[in-house]
Amino acid sequence: MSLKTKDNNEDRIIILNNYLASLINTRLAEMGIVHNGAGFTRDILNQITDLKIDVKYGVNLSGIENLEMLNRLTIYYRRRTEGLLKRNIASINEDDMKAISGCKSLTDLSIINQSFIEEIDVSGLTQLKSLQISFNQYLYKIKGLERLEGLEDLVIYGNNRLYPLKNLNEVILNNESLDLLRLDVLMFPDAIKYDKENGNCDINSLKKIAKLNAEWCEQINGWFPTSEIETIRMSKDQSYVKYNTAQMINLHNKSCQIIHDYVPKDCGAMDAVIGIEQYLAQNVKYDKKAKVLSSLQKSSFNGQIGGKNGSYSAIMGGIAQCEGYTHAMQYLLKLKGIRSHNVLCYVNNTNPIVQIVPINKAIIPK
């Protein structure tokens, strides 16, 4: 004679850390469900299908993988982080990111302005339809993009130190339902699989990018559009310079010509930098006219889209301000396979432009 036992998994109490428990209890209250404490049944946790986290100090998302019905997760931090010591920044960390990678039911994931993560692994999040990774200034690597085949929205830009995404062209081609594509300007060569040795590219990827009417963006002075916290399809608070694909093709082609004319093919990195600096010094003037315009992005060369702080205005129009020079230089360096990133640009009423230099973890005006 054998005994049968009832499966009590639904009644089992799952204890979560206080930070995560508080987030969940707040979300439950918004849904009209009263719950207190850090212990949850599976039935209660399964009520949480979406979560928006405005990161605070002491954040701890360990255990978030217990939200087995979680479909939409947005993690953001509203404060500008450039130039701040890490102790003055709130951000999720690598352990939190690993916990998020265990949320297998996610269809929408946004990671915005998190300074303590260096790697994001989405290889296990195969249900994703919408992915936004933006303004994470110390993010170096995104793993597993090639495992995603159901993406409808892909937004990756403003990640200042992100390594090249070698399979980005395949990601674009393999996601047949892709509808929204918003990427960093520096990712264009990766998106078309540009070969710096012979100048060839993936023409099929380029055709799809053009068909999607992709957006190509450059972040300005550490700002990020808070409207994108609400939805990645809304960018009314435009704190970046934006180009369409036709403009990117023009920018790319002229940049390739500049490299051909000013940088010897087989030279080292130092000679490449000198050649690029020589071109910018001789051919890009300061956009004095745009300085009096009220819009942060507007260029006297090409209005809103050109962006006085953008590489397009510098390379195509020969005029720029502030980050327009560095954005142009970054793109030219990218074509030579040289990695670079912007540092903080600080502006005030008495000093229009002040260089900020990090020394021994402190930020000192130079």
Predicted regions located by residue number:
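Secondary-structure boundary elements
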Residues: 244-314
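Solvent-exposed loop/turn segments at secondary-structure junctions
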Residues: 282-287, 321-322, 346-350
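Hydrophobic/aromatic-rich core segments of domains that either
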Residues: 324-366
